[in-house]
């Protein structure tokens, strides 16, 4: 006989609507505050808005759409925190309060939720002259 297994996640279809609503709110925050042109004030406001959403949403433990919603908020927060950390403009990251590149930020930014941001140097390979 095949043993019965307990599913890892429940699936509450009523949570789908809540997830889609949250997804739109997060998209609006990221577009307005962490879009193409960024400022420290806007990024801080975006972070506060994300925290407000996280505090007001009701998440069910081990429920699929609740997990996806939490992950969405976590990724958005990590994006904003790394943008706040980089006090420069480079490539697709433009801060109007720091409009020029700064070589201090030629690095890999490493972060985890709830931990300090740290960096590691970028190792550039020398081109072969042959």
Task: For each feature predicted by the language model, list its residue ranges.
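Glycine- and aromatic-enriched mobile tails/lids
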Residues: 1-130
């Amino acid at each position: 006989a095949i043993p019965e297994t307990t599913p890892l996640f429940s699936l509450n279809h009523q949570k789908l609507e809540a997830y889609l609503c949250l997804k739109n709110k997060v998209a609006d925050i990221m577009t307005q505050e962490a879009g193409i042109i960024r400022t420290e004030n806007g990024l801080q406001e975006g972070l506060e808005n994300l925290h407000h959403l996280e505090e007001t949403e009701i998440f069910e433990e081990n429920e699929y759409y609740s997990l996806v919603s939490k992950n969405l908020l976590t990724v958005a927060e990590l994006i904003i925190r790394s943008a706040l950390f980089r006090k420069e403009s480079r490539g697709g990251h433009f801060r109007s309060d720091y409009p020029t590149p700064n070589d201090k930020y030629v690095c890999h930014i490493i972060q985890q939720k709830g931990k300090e941001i740290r960096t590691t140097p970028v190792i550039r390979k020398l081109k072969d002259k042959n």
